[in-house]
Amino acid sequence: MDSPEAQALPVSELADRLDGWEEKTRAVFSGCVDDDLDAVMADTLERFPQSIQPYLDMIEGQRMDLTWTRYPRFDDLKLYCYRVAGTVGLMTQGVMGVDQAYTSAPWSDRPDTSDAAVALGIANQLTNILRDVGEDRGRGRIYLPLEDLQRFDYSEDDLMAGRLNQSWKDLMVFQLERAREWFDRSEAGVRWLSKDARWPVWTSLRLYRGILDAIERVDYDVFNHR
């Protein structure tokens, strides 16, 4: 929904496209294949069975971008982050697999990586939001929870004007701390992944955490730095 092509289209057409994606997704999960992309997806589902729900949740997240330009509470933003990013972790964890060391011992229970997978997606999306505050402002969007702006005495008008004051810095310190807490939640699950998947995921986690460090280095000026 963020591409230049998508932004040039009317909301009604974007909504129709998402309806089409939902219909196609349901069809593929039911075994109906119409094109090569469907065939690839069907083959993946056959080899790595999984629930359709994360895919439907992802589409719901895209629908939120058609109507939501503000998020009153963090709970609202967390739901959005789960839908557009946490779902990716649920989609891919079965493909990545779990290290046999955690499943072969007779006393071992197979670990559930779902919570960590969702946490990493939420952490990554929160990081994207913090990095892209200036860009989103230009599109009339504020993803930072309005309850947080109020808590730190920083208004929507302040954000739209790109005001860099102490209230903004205090607000951003709080936001970065929250994002890091979500990264912390995700780290425990990385060690459970299969050897081939562990390092790519760990590298991604470290790179995204590094974006938070970069925001600190520019003194939270995400209006003029990205």
Where are these regions (language model features)?
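Catalytic cores of Mg2+-dependent Asp-rich isoprenoid enzymes
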Residues: 2-124, 130, 134-226
